[in-house]
Amino acid sequence: MSEQKLAVNEYLKTDSDYLRGTIQEGLDTQVTGSFSDGDQQLIKFHGFYQQDDRDLRNERKEQKLEPLYSFMLRARVPGGICTPAQWLDVDKISSTLTTSNSIRLTTRQTFQYHGIPKRNLKTLIQGLDKAALDSIAACGDVNRNVMCNPNPVESKLHAQAYAVAKELSDHLLPHTRAYAEIWLDEEKLVGETVEPVYGNTYLPRKFKMAVSVPPDNDVDVYTNDLGFIAIAEDGQLVGFNLVAGGGMGSTHGEVETFPRLADDFGFIKTADVIKFAEAVMTVQRDWGNRVVRKRARLKYTIVDHGFDAFKAEVENRAGVKFAPKRDVVIGDRGDRYGWVEGIDSKWHLTLFIESGRIKDLPGQTLQTGLREIAKIHKGDFRMTSNQNMIIAGVAAEDKAEIEGLARKHGLMGQVLTGTRGHSIACVALPTCPLAMAEAERYFPEFIDHIDALQAKHGISDQSIVVRMTGCPNGCARPFAAEIGLVGKAPGRYNLYLGANFEGTRLNKMHKENIQEAEILAELDTLFGRYATERDAGETFGNFTVRIGVVKAVNDAAKDFHG
């Protein structure tokens, strides 16, 4: 592979002086709102992407203006936990330094800002730093934000799992001081240590990691490059089942790319988590495809080299053998809405945030509501991988005041079906440069149609996992949804069916490049059959496989496109 011409990103990383590139020069140049092509790749490692308003692109072109460039910045918040004081800072930044005046909760349990002018980037990052937050490695070819189940019931076990997620995030951070020098004005140190895990080429591609606490699977653990499924005995964490090789991204029409769920490798002790995480990452660093970038994810490395060879090399580098995996039940991927009491007698309020967008609208002043709650809350805020928010650690005597604020600002009280509560969508248009169709802006209306069809057929009590993305990169994990809509062109989507409710089987394309009317007509027919033909307890995804609408995907490399 070394004799072949590498992907252009590999040369950019090698020549970047550990992710510095010419970012500082680009930041100093205010003649344009953009960075150079090479630096646009490097800034991802610092936590942000260059975008433009695609709604205005043609108009500005006619006016002979450059696109209306702005930046999307994603924070690193392992496990999605922040304090009320931090949230107040996050909120203030969105109101003063972004043009979107909103906060977007993501499908990876953190938040991001949209509409940041280049001139505001440094001030914004310094504001995050003052709040003890950062965006280091939130994007780029590195380990990204580590997810962890925010289970509000088993709080002791959650605390133990969260500690592991936080340790993973901290241990696998890049060591380069480029972020501190460029954005925080810290001095460059003489004789900087090279990256001990990443090297100067970092990873071949993005790397996503999650820690789950069964039976909940809200983090969609099998869709990650590396996942740790907590195993408890008598309520205490004893270790994890390790899974590796998941990932959602693919490319329309290219069968050599496909989504994939992770393989089960075996059980490891808690004390060995860092060893195994580093071993998996360094094997991917050394074995991953650096020639064909679309085949660079860990899932392809395992497929190309073989499971047994990959497992043996991981064990060799970790210096520990996998034990047989422990039996575990994988259950619901949704969040528990409303109040739930934890084992510590504290209460936790999960608030539904449609598509994760926190913004003040008529009748729903969500951003103001969370701000007012943060001013009085004594616990913490927990972002979920379903784009929702948990007001965690509320004393019984404080519940009424918190709930009053939530209801006043439209954070509670909305009619929420099981299907809407299990639905997520990516941002897509107008800011995402990869989007081929709408997602976030259209998704609430689409779910209205789904709710109406379920009501028509008397199946409103059935929760169905529905997800929509504007392109096949899969940010909202659509290929693990019972109903997945993936953008193909404006107003057109590929319809995927057949994933299971728990997230341990992928879906498969049922209809290609169809519009809303055909999508709804197809689902109308299937919902009618599901209402009358389903077995007791049978979920919609399993039903579509059983009656032969789509075939089960058991081996994505062979079955997803076949």
From Swiss-Prot:
Pfam families, per database record: NIR_SIR (PF01077), NIR_SIR_ferr (PF03460)
Binding, siroheme: C475
Enzyme class: oxidoreductase
Record's keyword terms, sorted: 4Fe-4S, Amino-acid biosynthesis, Cysteine biosynthesis, Heme, Iron, Iron-sulfur, Metal-binding, NADP, Oxidoreductase
Family: Belongs to the nitrite and sulfite reductase 4Fe-4S domain family.
Catalytic activities: hydrogen sulfide + 3 NADP(+) + 3 H2O = sulfite + 3 NADPH + 4 H(+)
Function recorded in the entry: Component of the sulfite reductase complex that catalyzes the 6-electron reduction of sulfite to sulfide. This is one of several activities required for the biosynthesis of L-cysteine from sulfate.
Upper lineage: Bacteria, Pseudomonadati, Pseudomonadota, Gammaproteobacteria, Alteromonadales
EC number from the UniProt entry: 1.8.1.2
Cited Gene3D superfamilies: Sulfite Reductase Hemoprotein, domain 1
GO MF assignments: 4 iron, 4 sulfur cluster binding; heme binding; metal ion binding; NADP binding; sulfite reductase (ferredoxin) activity; sulfite reductase (NADPH) activity
Naturally occurring in which organism (per UniProt): Shewanella denitrificans (strain OS217 / ATCC BAA-1090 / DSM 15013)
NCBIfam families: CysI, PRK13504.1
GO-annotated cellular components: sulfite reductase complex (NADPH)
Quaternary structure and partners: Alpha(8)-beta(8). The alpha component is a flavoprotein, the beta component is a hemoprotein.
Residues reported to bind [4Fe-4S] cluster: C426, C432, C471, C475
CC cofactor note: Binds 1 siroheme per subunit.
Name of the protein described by the UniProt record: Sulfite reductase [NADPH] hemoprotein beta-component
InterPro entries: CysI (IPR011786), NiRdtase/SiRdtase_haem-b_fer (IPR005117), Nit/Sulf_reduc_fer-like_dom_sf (IPR036136), NO2/SO3_Rdtase_4Fe4S_dom (IPR006067), NO2/SO3_Rdtase_4Fe4S_prot (IPR045169), NO2/SO3_Rdtase_4Fe4S_sf (IPR045854), NO2/SO3_Rdtase_FeS/sirohaem_BS (IPR006066)
